[in-house]
Design a protein with these regions (language model features):
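A short, active-site helix/loop in glycosyltransferases that binds the activated sugar's phosphate group
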Residues: 138-166, 171-176
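Conserved acidic donor-binding segment of nucleotide-sugar-dependent glycosyltransferases
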Residues: 299-312, 319-326
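Acidic donor-binding loop of glycosyltransferase active sites
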Residues: 194, 255-270, 283
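Conserved donor-binding/catalytic core segment of Leloir-type glycosyltransferases
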Residues: 4, 182-217, 221
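Nucleotide-activated donor-binding/catalytic signature segment of Leloir-type glycosyltransferases, i.e.
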Residues: 230-251
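N-terminal strand-loop element at the rim of the active site
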Residues: 6-16, 20-70, 226
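Short hydrophobic beta-strand element within catalytic cores of glycosyltransferases
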Residues: 280, 284-288
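Short His-centered aromatic/hydrophobic patch
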Residues: 91-98
Length: 368
């Protein structure tokens, strides 16, 4: 079976949240007989397809980038060509250009969309986009949400309950962190600290985290790409900023840390792959209750602590709890690892998607 994934960005240009999910799906379904192509946009597209692991990355020329939306003239032809070779087309929402391409370059194949997030930030443009979005979601054969929490809280998904299913995001297990790297980072940041890892974006709740760090005085390490000027301006001696780190460095930091803090306060944080990585590492977590998958990964009182969003006092209290109660923190970390093994492995996600692909392709044959 051949599957075409379609999203606005992908490797080698970008490899953050959704791109990592696409990569995991492609690699985890490869062992189940699925051949994968990924089409995305790039300001500097590669002249020929790139091999990424077991799958192929294709790039169309990005002509404009407006309101977090890449636009392209050539992607229509590229999409038609690749869709013609595929058995099924797998979209990743939200991206308005994708909806337009689907509508104008009808793939004529079974289609599904992984619904990663509501449109949260661009509320003004949402009024203009809503008709196209409605047409797109009505016309695809299946919609996949990444957590039952998001299905329950999304007003958009409520309109399509008859074709919505849940496949949680999963990640592959990894070998233990490199000992030499662990030692080098220990020399730099210490062996006991709370950790935040993630892109430094508007919805990550970093101002509240800094306020909590100020009030508690607890050592905090922040690692991630983005504008760190606000962190620097806070001038907190107990906060260490590392900038973007490699996957190997991330594993080492997770090995060292006492607990993982993930204070995202807006629904733009639809799941939180970084939380999965912390659970995989067996670390207790702190996250906010925002009606999304973050509270599906992190169960309050079981794998960690959930708090109200944008509440630095509650965040400070949760951080202090993890810091001052090692026995409870360890128990939560063990439970987090167990929950990862039960629900959130890459194999589990790949198996579920492969089964859905087979179901949709079989249904498509039945309609012919």
């Amino acid at each position: 079976m051949r599957v075409l994934h379609f999203f606005k960005t992908y490797l080698p240009d970008s490899f953050t949240g959704v791109e990592r999910v696409i990569h995991e799906i492609a690699e985890s379904t490869a062992t189940l007989g699925v051949s994968t192509d990924v089409l995305s946009l790039s300001p500097r597209p590669a002249a020929s397809p790139l091999t990424i692991g077991t799958h192929r990355s294709h790039q169309s020329k990005q002509d404009l980038y407006v309101a977090s939306t890449g636009l392209s003239r050539t992607v229509f032809a590229d999409f038609r060509r690749l869709a013609a070779q595929a058995d099924i087309v797998h979209y990743h929402f939200p991206w308005p250009m994708m909806d337009l391409v689907h509508s104008l370059a009808n793939p004529g194949k079974p289609t599904l969309v992984t619904y990663h997030s509501d449109v949260v930030k661009q509320q003004g443009l949402l009024r203009l986009y809503r008709p196209l979005m409605g047409h797109f979601l009505s016309s695809v054969d299946a919609i996949v949400a990444t957590s039952p929490n998001y299905v329950q809280s999304s007003a958009v998904l409520a309109q399509y309950r008859d074709k919505v299913s849940v496949i949680p995001i999963g990640i592959t297990d990894v070998p233990p962190a490199d000992r030499g790297l662990v030692d080098r980072l220990r020399a730099r940041v210490g062996s006991r600290f709370l950790l935040f890892v993630g892109a430094l974006r508007y919805y990550k709740g970093l101002p509240f985290l800094l306020e909590a760090a100020r009030s508690t005085g607890l050592p905090l390490v922040i690692a991630g790409a983005g504008d760190a000027s606000g962190i620097a301006e806070a001038k907190l001696g107990n906060v260490t900023v590392l900038g973007e780190v490699s996957d190997a460095e991330k594993l080492a930091l997770l090995k060292l840390c006492t607990g993982f803090v993930f204070p995202s306060h807006l629904r733009s944080e639809a799941f939180g792959v970084a939380l999965l990585e912390a659970a995989r590492a067996g670390k207790p977590m702190i996250s906010c209750e925002i009606g999304t998958g973050t509270s599906y990964v992190n169960l309050d009182g079981v794998t960690g602590i959930t708090i109200p969003p944008a509440d630095p006092a509650a965040l400070a209290e949760a951080m202090t709890t993890l810091w001052t109660d090692p026995a409870r923190s360890e128990a939560m970390g063990i439970a987090a690892r167990r929950r990862y093994e039960t629900l959130f492995t890459g194999k589990a996600m790949g198996t579920a998607y492969a089964a859905l692909y087979e179901k949709l392709v079989a249904a498509g044959r039945g309609r012919r």
